[in-house]
């Protein structure tokens, strides 16, 4: 089991005060399991309120099982505007494969709560599990479209050094121990689809999600309701980065995926 050292609430608050003095307006909390420790999260956001830190915050990698109306209300008061959830898949068997310890109903409830409370809600999905098929992809894309999300990202699966997926692939001889990041690719017997095919499927998912008139209308209403066209600006930025950015992503990844031993 991996060990980690968390920062104290006091330490984070002090850094935020420094950033505010330096003129920063927006801060993103980058944490692979943000809100996992609810007690610490409550102390952090209450501390932000008590210290009168007037900034906007983006919370990344929010856990579905950490979704709580009281906690979300406190986060809203503290200045959190965006919540990003790692949802991974619209298929229960794939969620189980990734050991997500959640289900589709809990995911839907978490996204509904986030949307209800007015957060700009982002969901990320991973495509390319070893046994994932076209039907799985279609189900995930349709599941994403059925949720009240303000933004999505469909990304190809990557095997990262030290992860269970990576360790298993190394033991099976599919990945060298010197390769620190490897993307799913049937050319290497990592799944049923080539990396290029996965990128194409991700692009398809983005087009289907963002090109819906109902989605565009909903975001316009949300921008007006919040009297904050930052929502709309976020959409425009995310729209172009997701629709067109993945083509650049393809060229970038091929240059950076492997470690030169």
Q: What kind of region is each of these model predictions?
A:
Residues 22, 63-72, 94-104, 125-130, ...:
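Hydrophobic transmembrane alpha-helix bundles
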Residues 116, 142, 146, 204-207:
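Charged/polar positions on well-ordered alpha helices
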Residues 3, 27, 55, 151, ...:
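Secondary-structure transition/capping residues
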Residues 164-261:
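Radical SAM enzyme core and accessory elements
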Residues 38-39, 93, 97, 127-135, ...:
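Flexible glycine/acidic-rich beta-alpha junction loops that bind and position SAM and/or redox cofactors
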Residues 1-122, 127-129, 136, 142:
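Radical SAM [4Fe-4S] cluster-binding motif and immediate context
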